[in-house]
A protein has these predicted regions:
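Extended, Lys/Arg-rich, non-catalytic nucleic-acid recognition/anchoring regions
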Residues: 180-182
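C-type cytochrome heme-c attachment and multiheme electron-transfer modules
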Residues: 2-58, 65-70, 74-178, 200-204, ...
Length: 547
């Protein structure tokens, strides 16, 4: 029997392969799910994504039929199959890791990407530099540090380990829903642009600082409606981060984080009024601007929030607004000589126009008798009109090498478990000091008592660093503090709570707070900023800040 020629065998194999391929293609073409028509945006671009996601509802400017899906979420808008269409997709276009390919491309918001990355909300430069300086790891508090540099380098130290584990959820490089098992409130922080510019659609629960859920925000992304992309940022988005440290977000809406007693009790049970982290709170006087219906963005400008492209060291450098921007004869100009876009003259009177609701707020001039009194020339507006401020005394910080804790930048648990506690917290009689030749309000910021525990459970080190920091409390009231409250209060003057006594022509002060026993010995009283002879007892948050 003769064998068939090799060429014949090759041709047969080729024909078999060709028929198999054709069969596969025919099968795929007859079984693939095709949209009834090609989807095209109003700009004329083919966007097959809309064929599947036609029911997604967005705001008008970002509607799918206008923008499509791929300009924001990337992927392949020409593909028909889900697998091909979703290749290279990003869940959050606002993430600063991808923003240059999404939100910040030409035709959308091209200048914002680089600006936001240099903003203090993204870099945390002031927080990092000041922490390192306070803890003796830097020569000054103006160093060029950033969250991005920490993520790229992996750099750590005692101070940076503390930041990574207890502080690093309030910056724009944080990803949304990146903290397994953490409450939803913490998972909703961060996300770059979407940290501020997205909200849940109407009908969906919108989380606030006092109505947070205890579930984890990263357990299920299915069946979650697409958030709305908004320009008019609600105050709830700001307060996601601005509810610790200076607590200005809480103070503005009249919330004071109280002691952990849970008083006043309700029905023999601790108070139900709690903040994330199981913190109790009291409702007291909110800021007069909040009473009038104003939100954060009504005052704060785009450049000072999102940055203007300059790598500022501290927020007072990035800040543009001041009280006189509104309350002066010719309002509407910032400290950096820029015009704001929501102050207008109506019927002969200046008004501020709310950016969310369009409400007109009349701008009153300062009281000539009190505010313009010659003796008050150096007194800042908030020194009189901020009637309360959160004062967190004694920050007890412990690091235990025997336990691990989640590093919020790497999302990995590493050795060293940090715990914080305080001596006490108060709100009354804001203390005054002098900064940049102006009388300002100060509050503890921070009064660190640091202790480290080694692997054997022994104390391996520790130090104290007490600092008073200038603050704009965001608790403005129409009626200012009384003369007595400033001129006859030892606490307001920086001495602390106590009694002033004159004997034999000499003045003496007897403080209520006697200080703490620490590894470095007895401290000064926590609310004692200065002696009656004018000697500073604690550091100032800036070199030129003094009692």
């Amino acid at each position: 029997m003769t064998r068939p020629p090799g060429k014949l065998i090759g041709a047969f194999v080729f024909l078999l392969l060709a028929m198999t391929l054709i069969g596969y293609l025919v099968f795929r073409e007859t079984t693939i799910k095709r949209p009834p028509q090609i989807s095209v945006t109003t700009a004329g671009y083919v966007e097959m994504c809309v064929s599947c996601h036609a029911k997604v509802k967005l705001d008008t400017a970002h509607a799918a039929n206008v923008v499509g899906c791929s300009p924001c979420h990337l992927g392949n808008p020409l593909a028909i199959s889900k697998k091909e269409a979703h290749k290279g997709m990003v869940l959050n276009p606002g993430d600063l890791r991808v923003v240059d390919k999404t939100c910040a491309v030409a035709g959308c918001h091209p200048t914002y990407g680089s600006r936001v990355k240099k903003s203090l909300m993204a870099t945390n430069r002031g927080i990092l530099a000041t922490l390192l300086y306070y803890w003796g790891e830097a020569d000054n508090q103006n160093g060029d540090y950033s969250v991005k540099k920490l993520m790229d380098s992996g750099r750590t130290s005692l101070a940076l380990d503390y930041y990574r584990k207890l502080c690093a959820t309030c910056h724009l490089w944080k990803k949304k829903n990146d903290l397994p098992g953490y409450p939803k409130f913490f998972n909703e922080k961060g996300g770059g642009c979407t940290a501020c510019h997205d909200v849940q659609p109407k009908g969906e629960p919108r989380m606030t600082i006092t109505s947070f859920a205890g579930d984890s925000g990263n357990d299920s992304k299915k069946n979650r409606p697409h958030p709305l992309i908004i320009k008019k940022v609600p105050e709830a988005n700001c307060i996601r981060c601005h509810n610790r440290s200076g607590r200005i977000g809480l103070s503005y809406i009249g919330i004071f984080e109280s002691e952990g007693y849970g008083t006043p009790y309700q029905g023999c049970e601790p108070s139900p009024h709690r903040l994330p982290g199981n913190r109790f709170y009291l409702k007291i006087a909110d800021d007069v601007h909040h009473k009038k219906g104003m939100v954060c963005i009504d005052c704060h400008t785009q450049n000072e929030i999102m940055g203007d492209g300059t790598n500022y060291a501290h927020y007072e450098d990035q800040l543009e607004i001041s009280c006189v921007m509104c309350h002066s004869k010719n309002p509407g100009t910032t400290r950096k000589n820029k015009k704001v876009n929501n102050i207008e003259k109506k019927n002969g009177h200046f008004v501020l126009i709310g950016k969310i609701d369009g409400r007109q707020h009349p701008l009153d001039l300062p009281n000539k008798t009190v505010c313009l009194y010659p003796g008050h020339k150096r007194v800042s507006c908030e020194a009189c009109h901020s009637t309360w401020v959160p004062q967190c005394y004694g920050c007890h910080v412990k690091r235990d090498e025997r336990e691990t804790q989640l590093d919020k930048l790497t999302i990995k648990a590493t050795a060293g478990w940090w715990q914080e506690g305080r001596s006490y917290i108060r709100y009354e009689k804001p203390m005054l000091a002098v900064w940049r030749n102006r009388v300002v309000i100060v509050t503890p910021g921070c009064q660190d008592v640091v202790t480290t525990i080694d692997k054997n459970g022994h104390i391996s080190g520790g130090f104290n660093r007490f600092t008073m920091a200038a603050i704009s409390p965001h608790t403005t009231q129409a009626k200012g503090r009384s003369c007595k409250d400033c001129h006859a209060s030892p606490k307001t003057l920086g001495l602390g709570e106590g009694t002033v006594v004159e004997k034999n022509g000499k003045w003496r002060f007897f403080p209520v707070d006697k200080g703490l026993n620490t590894l470095e010995g007895r401290t000064v009283g926590l609310d004692n900023f200065v002696t009656i002879d004018g000697k500073p007892l604690q550091h100032g948050s800036r070199k030129d800040l003094r009692p």
